[in-house]
């Protein structure tokens, strides 16, 4: 990166994170980061352990998201923080709980990306409820909650993205389709 800085060439830098990392790790890259792209997958540590063997996930991920919200400066026209909410089968309530936490503890102005694309693989195929895709009802409960909490910035994948062949559907959402509040942001 130093040769780019020496030439005063500045490219947008996106920190793409599972959210399960320490704030001290994030601080090492704070000066480089233009946009922090964080996941909030679980709102319950027992789910995080069962699905990802990630003890203390909730505290770690929420601390990381809060740190990014408070510390990542806005540079360029990109938002400094985007939070991805992957709706998991049997755990839509946790996605809703994470949206509630974002709205009440940080801001409903944070852009969110609500995703339906969970596809069971490997050991998940043997582990209910992760052995199935998200139902349309589960997914709709989360998208409705996002609107209820006042989120208007971000993206909503079409439910059909739960089909692995269509997992990237929603990348270029047409006006009024898929974006929160009927607007693309």
What are these regions (language model features)?
Residues 73-80, 85-185:
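Auxiliary Fe-S-binding modules of radical SAM enzymes
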Residues 1-72, 156:
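Core AdoMet radical
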């Amino acid at each position: 990166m130093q040769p780019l800085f020496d030439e005063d060439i500045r490219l947008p830098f996106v920190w793409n994170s599972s959210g399960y990392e320490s704030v001290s790790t994030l601080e090492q890259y704070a000066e480089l980061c233009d946009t922090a792209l964080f996941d909030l997958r679980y709102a319950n540590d027992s789910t995080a352990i069962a699905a990802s063997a990630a003890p203390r996930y909730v505290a770690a991920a929420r601390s990381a998201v809060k740190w990014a919200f408070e510390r990542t400066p806005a540079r360029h026209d990109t938002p400094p923080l985007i939070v991805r909410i992957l709706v998991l089968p049997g755990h839509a309530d946790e996605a809703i709980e994470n949206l509630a936490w974002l709205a009440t503890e940080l801001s409903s102005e944070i852009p969110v990306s609500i995703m339906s694309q969970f596809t069971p693989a490997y050991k998940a195929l043997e582990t209910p409820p992760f052995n199935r895709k998200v139902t349309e009802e589960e997914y709709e409960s989360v998208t409705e909650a996002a609107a209820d909490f006042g989120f208007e910035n971000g993206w909503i994948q079409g439910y059909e993205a739960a089909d692995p062949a269509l997992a990237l559907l929603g990348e270029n959402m047409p006006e009024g389709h898929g974006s929160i509040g009927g607007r693309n942001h």
